[in-house]
Amino acid sequence: MTDTIGAGQPGQDAFPPVEELSYEQARDELIETVKILELGQMGLDESLKYWERGEALAKACEAHLDGASKRVEEALRKNAEGTDSAAHNEEAGED
């Protein structure tokens, strides 16, 4: 068995690189990985490979969510600045 998890190399154990997965793809694969691990029907080495893959997928999901959160915060900040600026202009009689 070759170690190709996350390498995107062809083979029975190959998974696409985590960095190339969208949030939804990583989340769905993580769910499937957890289901596979919960079955407990693999040997130790294979279980560890799936566990390591699951950890990488969880980190990728967290990174996607952190990025989305920052984008929302930035958009809200810009919106608040625009609202404050428009209100200030109205108070000053500038339309």
From Swiss-Prot:
Keywords: Cytoplasm, Exonuclease, Hydrolase, Nuclease. It catalyses: Exonucleolytic cleavage in either 5'- to 3'- or 3'- to 5'-direction to yield nucleoside 5'-phosphates. It holds the Pfam family Exonuc_VII_S. GO terms for molecular function: exodeoxyribonuclease VII activity. InterPro entries: Exonuc_VII_S, Exonuc_VII_ssu_sf. It is an enzyme of class 3 (hydrolase). Its EC number is 3.1.11.6. Gene3D superfamilies: Exonuclease VII, small subunit. It is found in: Cytoplasm. One of its GO terms (biological process) is DNA catabolic process. Its main location: cytoplasm. GO terms for cellular component: cytosol; exodeoxyribonuclease VII complex. HAMAP family: Exonuc_7_S. Bidirectionally degrades single-stranded DNA into large acid-insoluble oligonucleotides, which are then degraded further into small acid-soluble oligonucleotides. Belongs to the XseB family. Heterooligomer composed of large and small subunits. This is Exodeoxyribonuclease 7 small subunit. It comes from Corynebacterium aurimucosum (strain ATCC 700975 / DSM 44827 / CIP 107346 / CN-1) (Corynebacterium nigricans).
